[in-house]
Amino acid sequence: MQVTLPYGGDKTVSFNVPEENFDGFLKPGVLAPASDPVRAIERAVDRPIGSPTLDKIVRSGTRVAVICDDLSRPTPVSTVLPVILDRLIRAGVRREDIHMVMALGSHRAMTPDEIRTRVGADVYANYRVVNSEFRDPASLINLGRTADGVDIVVTREAMDADVRIGIGNIVPHPVMGWSGGGKILFPGVTGEHTVAQFHMLGGLSDQRLVGLEDSHVRLRMESWVPKIGLDFVVNTILDAKFRIVRVVAGDYIKAHRAGVETAKVLMRCRMERPADVIVVSSYPADEDFWQSAKGFFNSEGGLKDAASTMILVTPNYEGMGPHPEYGECTGDDNVGVRLKKLYDGEDIPGDPLAIAVGTSMSKLRRRCRLVVVSDGVTRAEMDECKIEHYPLCELQKAVDVTLSRYEHPVVAAVSHGGEYLL
């Protein structure tokens, strides 16, 4: 039978698999989208969870930074922003006292056209919008050390405000459990060393963290948030067609946890039995291998055992991503030793983020067999990762070769690997 998967946002690809082996597409629950998305945002903002309303948080003279996630996320920022800005202006905040910060984390800077599309043409024309900074010391400020010994270094633009509001979206995350909430600050607007801290915690953990709302990494991150200050969040939960199902707003912990409960219904898939082979599209996390590998982490829970295989079908439009050493670290069986030394404060050469995330990937590829089908990364790059690679034109070959390794394989498919959780 023929199986069709998304390949990026505007293309599909197909392969054949024996019908007797195919257990079908793994699908989560279904919830109806909001009939009026703007009204859903307004209701959430006006009835916050665990927080005062915005008119009780700001007043005339308050300087506000609205921190928005970047183009690697499907968050409908251009729909959410006007509601927030309307409430701020109505509360007396002057337009010139409001600016937007695009929370890049370690991702590349967004172009002016990308920012305009992200925030909306009207907002772009009438407000100051800046990218966060990750490495430039002159654009970062050290707020000091937390009780557990982490230096909080943050982009100055985020601190040039009395009040910070975060806009994000809730989906599974390999390290943080779920995105959203305080994650808009960590790693959104923090510097390289600080960003590396929570990725190190993820790399050092042997626990599967994706899908845990109270993972030890998230709890530590949330304990760092007061050092920067996050006064209000607005988080969306979207369905597979990126329609708003629910919006939560208010306290960065209480509102986030309420949103996670909805996200679990929309994104957690149920399986009749574990699979020998899972073919997963990275959609919508298609930007690069740094992002698309989420499809592996999200789908691992559906595998039968260590002999099982995941085949990731992904465009990787921007190649391996922003960290050139990521591939080498992924392919290093002993990269965890480097990570532990780095975490213990030793001066270890190399990109700390590549070492941290590479450790998580190195562990994953040793727990099961990984295959990447992509025209966006090369065989040489995947060889460095110790991951099998096929170009897109050989998708069928990748499936056939993989199935030939099993006597009676159980095969499943995942259409939205960047968001669905097994």
Label for each model-derived stretch:
Residues 1-44:
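N-terminal amphipathic/basic leader segments beginning at the initiator methionine
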Residues 49-65, 90-96, 269-277, 303-305, ...:
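Glycine-rich phosphate/diphosphate-binding loops that line cofactor/substrate pockets in enzymes
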Residues 63-74, 99-105, 278-281:
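Short glycine-rich or small-residue beta-strand-to-loop segments that form or flank ligand, phosphate
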Residues 65-67, 165-167, 277-281, 311, ...:
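Structural motif
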Residues 89, 294-422:
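C-terminal non-catalytic interaction/assembly regions of soluble proteins
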Residues 110-178:
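An acidic, phosphate/nucleotide-engaging active-site surface
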Residues 147-150, 154-212, 221:
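Divalent-metal (Mg2+/Mn2+/Ca2+)-assisted nucleotide/phosphate chemistry catalytic cores
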Residues 208-286:
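Membrane-embedded hairpin module used as a gating/binding unit in multi-pass transport
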